[in-house]
A protein has these predicted regions:
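N-terminal subdomain of nucleotide-sugar transferases
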Residues: 1-62, 248
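Donor nucleotide-sugar binding/catalytic pocket of nucleotide-sugar-dependent glycosyltransferases
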Residues: 62, 157-160, 168-211
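Acceptor-binding helix/loop patch of EC 2.4 sugar-transfer enzymes
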Residues: 72-85, 130-165
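Acidic donor-binding loop of glycosyltransferase active sites
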Residues: 175, 290-307, 318-321
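Conserved catalytic-core segment of nucleotide-activated headgroup transferases in glycan assembly
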Residues: 201-211, 216-294
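Short hydrophobic beta-strand element within catalytic cores of glycosyltransferases
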Residues: 311-314, 321-325
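Conserved acidic donor-binding segment of nucleotide-sugar-dependent glycosyltransferases
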Residues: 340-347, 355-361
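A short, well-ordered alpha-helix in the C-terminal region of glycosyltransferases
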Residues: 355, 362-377, 386-389
């Protein structure tokens, strides 16, 4: 098949969840299909990644979008038009004209739009379109707004309402909408009942899977939280770990360390000697893997909605037991006390940490069960095959509709 894939980021290096997802899909889809990639970029040095991506793509087109989102032009456009800020700051005239030219020149089988907010670049066309929602964006932003001081909320909430309107609008424009979980699929169905939907889950990178499950140090445990701290949910989780979980743990344990790692981790301030902040460069996959390999537990106090968490899938693939909130594991086909331990407040997190460290059988069961599930359900080879079938269904559905 000839696939036109449009992404709001350059999918290399695999620094964010979206980039990890797209790169792994490209890796496997390119074996049987011709992929024409159109990606938005902010900084000129991102163009150097074209060389790496060439092996997966028939053509690559990088299109400039605003380097700094908070430009006066963007702010005024978001305030005085019907478009939400997310669409405004991700819009590129270059991408719009590039896609228009590609559609004239190449006979595509399907257009793959990764996120709804790149859909404005795609003109009216007879080519069937698959819109992939990595998360329900307006719900993510609503969660953020709900945490703001009450006197600020009304001003920002207007943008959330616009976001919801346009997200729903582009769901209706697509031939089929795919989500990363059944949970998000049901949320879309609640909003617009007659939308055609499918589920294309996230996965764990091939490099994260251990060949054998290793014994971990439970005597002097290392508790890891890893994420990209550009995202609000990860900052929220880091602060909860330091301010809520850590003081409770210190009352119960002595020899332990908390590692908070990721891009922009340096934004996190703490003077507690038990917390180690580790900055990870965007292309340093080896450091990420080593942290997963050398930690004892992965703690994920995530309270923001949407998507599925690649960080949790990576921990499962690495044989690292996970303690997370109910929200954190939403959309994943995993069970409490079988694949992970669920904790929804600071007391429960401490309780589950102590339980996992003191019960060797439970610890090993969590390792083995989550690893086997990741291997079976959350590997990118199988996921890409599911996506190929969805492409065929999109094409068939469009033919029947016409």
């Amino acid at each position: 098949m000839k696939i036109l894939m449009v992404t709001p980021y350059v999918p290399y290096p695999p620094a964010s969840g979206g980039q990890i997802r797209t790169l792994n899909l490209l890796k496997y889809l390119s074996r049987k299909n011709d992929i024409y990639l159109v990606s938005l970029y902010k900084h000129e040095d991102e163009k150097r990644h074209i060389e790496f991506l060439t092996k997966y793509c028939k053509e690559i087109h990088l299109c400039k979008r605003p380097e700094k989102p908070w430009q006066l032009k963007n702010i005024l456009t978001a305030i005085f038009t019907s478009k939400p800020f997310l669409i405004v700051r991700n819009f590129s005239e270059d991408a719009k004209s590039t896609i228009k030219d590609l559609l004239k020149r190449v006979q595509f089988d399907v257009i793959h739009s990764e996120t709804f907010y790149v859909m404005p670049h795609i003109p009216k066309t007879h080519v069937p379109t698959l819109l992939v929602e990595q998360t329900i964006e307006y719900k993510v932003y609503k969660h953020f707004v709900d945490g703001l001081p009450f006197f600020i909320r009304p001003f920002i909430f207007i943008d959330v309402l616009k976001l919801r309107h346009w997200e729903r609008y582009y769901w209706n424009q697509a031939t089929l909408v795919a989500t990363v979980s059944n949970h998000d699929k049901e949320l879309i169905k609640e909003e617009v009942s007659d939308i055609n939907t499918a589920v294309i889950p996230n996965g764990a990178g091939d490099e994260m899977f251990e060949k054998t499950i290793k014994h971990r140090n439970t005597i002097d445990p290392v508790l890891l939280f890893l994420g990209n701290f550009f995202w609000l949910q990860n900052m929220e989780a880091a602060q909860f770990t330091i301010k809520k979980i850590l003081p409770q743990l210190e009352k119960k344990m002595q020899n332990f360390k908390i590692v908070i790692a990721g891009q922009q981790a340096k934004k996190i301030n703490t003077t507690n000697s038990k917390v180690q902040i580790v900055e990870i460069e965007e292309d340093n996959a080896d450091k990420v893997k080593k942290l997963y390999q050398t930690s004892t537990l992965f703690i994920a106090p995530i309270f923001g909605p949407g998507g599925t968490r690649l960080k949790i899938l990576a921990a499962m693939a690495a044989g690292l037991p996970v303690i997370s909130t109910s929200v954190g594991i939403e959309g994943l086909n995993i069970k409490d006390n079988q694949h992970v331990l669920v904790a929804n407040n600071k007391e429960q997190f401490v309780e589950k940490v102590l339980l996992a460290l003191s019960n060797q059988k439970l610890y090993q069961d969590l390792q083995n069960n989550s690893y086997e599930l990741a291997l079976k359900k959350y590997n990118w080879k199988n996921i890409s095959e599911e996506l190929e079938q969805v492409y065929k269904n999109v094409k068939k559905h469009d033919e029947n509709r016409n």
